[in-house]
Regions:
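Extended alpha-helical targeting/anchoring segments
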Residues: 1-6, 10-283
Length: 283
């Protein structure tokens, strides 16, 4: 029934739009925090970190949680979406990013690093794709996170089995283009899904490099914890296969309050104004 409703483009849903989002950072404060991250980067304390801010609004009384999910779902074509409705909290995820897939004892991870907004003009859009592919800054971000994830899955994979299958490949969605890499490995004997998640959470693409220090910087500068955002949503089968996303582009509804985080990776040649705009483009 939900599948059929996802295909409906009903006027009722289109009319029930949720607006008036308020960030927990002003633009100036967001930029100042990026400048502080740049100080850490320039001192060699970190090489990259993922910095985000949170938008909050009150849910309109005439909107059900399902309507909110469907309304956004009409506007996205992301492959790793999820709708989780519990008694006290609802999670509507429109993630384009696979975190971990396990099939036949093979581990697959596909980090996203590098984003540019799409254009409805085809010629201009081709130029934007070219700009993204040739961006040294975005490629540097992608390469660093590939190294982080290679290291993470090497802890639970057979020696010599970890391979980069795709490096900084363009993947296009309705509103943005991304640079996506894919790393694979063969799991060691006596390793299960929980071991894999323990070795890889939180995802390298939403923390930074080196991972632990990047997480400390995030904890210092972000005003609130991320909740499910940037964690993992997925399933584990009886055969021990699994598939998890990283819940970016994710709406959380709690006590009739809607929140959505957005941000991006910061490296030494990041431009604070551009980073702020990229975070907005992802909403």
């Amino acid at each position: 029934r939900l599948s059929s409703r996802l295909c409906e483009r009903s006027e009722a849903i289109q009319e029930k739009k949720q607006t008036n989002l308020t960030s927990n950072f002003t633009k100036n404060n967001y930029i100042k925090n990026i400048e502080k991250i740049l100080d850490y980067l320039n001192s060699g304390d970190i090489f990259q970190t993922n910095f985000t801010h949170k938008y909050i609004t009150q849910k309109k009384s005439n909107l059900s949680d399902q309507h909110i999910y469907l309304n956004f779902r009409h506007k996205t074509t992301t492959p790793f979406s999820a709708y989780l409705n519990f008694s006290d909290i609802c999670i509507c995820s429109y993630s384009p990013e696979r975190f971990i897939k396990i099939i036949d004892n093979k581990v697959i991870t596909s980090p996203i690093k590098g984003t540019i907004k799409k254009s409805s003009d085809r010629a201009k859009d081709h130029k934007l794709i070219k700009k993204l592919k040739e961006s040294k800054k975005n490629l540097a971000e992608n390469l660093m996170i590939v190294d982080v994830l290679r290291n993470d899955i090497s802890r639970i994979c057979k020696k010599g089995s970890v391979k980069v299958k795709e490096l900084a490949t363009i993947k296009s969605y309705r509103n943005v283009h991304h640079l996506v890499s894919t790393i694979t490995g063969k799991m060691n004997k006596n390793i299960d899904v929980i071991d894999v998640l323990g070795a890889t959470l939180p995802g390298g693409s939403v923390t930074g490099a080196p991972k632990i220090r990047a997480m400390e910087v995030i904890s210092e500068l972000e005003k609130s914890n991320r909740g499910v955002y940037c964690g993992a949503i997925g399933y584990i089968s009886f055969s021990q296969d699994a598939d998890f996303n990283i819940p970016i582009r994710t709406v959380t509804i709690f006590n009739d309050q809607i929140s959505i985080n957005c941000g991006g990776g910061i490296v030494s040649d990041s431009k604070p104004e551009s980073e702020f705009q990229e975070s907005i483009d992802k909403i």
